[in-house]
Amino acid sequence: MKQMMSLPLYSGSFAEYQGWEDLRAELNRLGCDGLEGVWGGEEFPPDLPAELVVGYHLTFYPDWLDLYRDDRPALIRKFGSLDTARRFYGGLGPETLLEQYRQDLDRAAALGAKYVVFHVSDVSLEEGYTYQWLHSSAEVIDAAVEVINTILTGRDWPFAFLVENQWWPGFTFTDPEETARLLDGIRCPDKGILLDTGHLMNANTALRTQEEGAAYINAMLDLHGSLAAAVRGVHLHQSLSGAYVGSNTGFLPQNLPEDYMERFGESYSHILRIDQHRPWSSPGILPVLERIAPRWLTHEISSRGRRARAEAVENQIKLLRQGGLSGA
């Protein structure tokens, strides 16, 4: 099992370290084999050591299906105008989305990533509050399969292509038929699942303890039967936001800004309260990880700055070591 630390690949993150050797030393000290990176909107430094980046999280828009379908009335309803939508996405129509994915796949290949991660979900700002869905999971999965097959066609990519679960419409890892629909549709031999433990916990708002969360993850693995063998990677964190969701969803806040970007910023803090990305402290997750035996495990923990990030990752790795899951 290779263990990674999640880190945005941009100048602000890199500035927290005194060069690449300092970053490499930090990873070694923590017991990580490298990074799972995500593009930060900037060109990568030319001297970025490629061996540091083991995994690569592909770019994503939480709300992309109407862009891909070129459903302009829907975009106007959400953004207020097509001009605002164009500025947000960098263009309009399906090719805007596809080209951004192609460019990101090229970045991953150039870095020598061993795997890439692709979100399969769709949620608008309003849905994030109301929990009243505009699209079904089947719609999202079918469109995602179409996108994936389009961007992967015509080239032998040097990495595994892993789909990540969310708790919005799309791939949730709570319905084996939907999971099979997704995996069967992807025309890529080197494919699999990146199971996000916190996202799976978000799918069950009745959970109140880490132990309950671990049991629920185990139950979903049971439910999936032989499909569970498709899990090749894990995003390890925990999220117990059911009480918050119960009190703060089902309706739109009265004073949401009219400007889309202001509304986006305000809703982002709401989503962070749902998707908490906290480190595990309960050993209840250890038998689950032993059962999965992932090839890649990323410590994807919310933190502010280098010190907090290192402390959170270190604590979670200590927990794994207690269970004899120290890595490769």
Q: Model regions: which residues?
A:
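Aromatic- and acidic-residue-enriched segments that line the glycan-binding/catalytic groove
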Residues: 65-76, 135, 249-256
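N-terminal pre-domain/capping segments
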Residues: 1-103, 323-328
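Active-site acidic/histidine proton-transfer and metal-coordination neighborhood
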Residues: 90-192
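Hydrophobic faces of well-ordered beta-strands that scaffold small-molecule active sites
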Residues: 2-10, 33-37, 52-58, 116-118, ...
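Amphipathic, non-transmembrane alpha-helical secondary structure
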Residues: 21-25, 43-46, 98-109, 142-149, ...
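Histidine-acidic metal/acid-base catalytic patches
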Residues: 1-3, 98, 102-103, 112-114, ...
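A short acidic, glycine-rich active-site loop
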Residues: 83-94, 138, 266-277
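Acidic-and-aromatic substrate-binding clefts and catalytic sites of carbohydrate-active enzymes
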Residues: 12-19, 31-47, 62-66, 95, ...
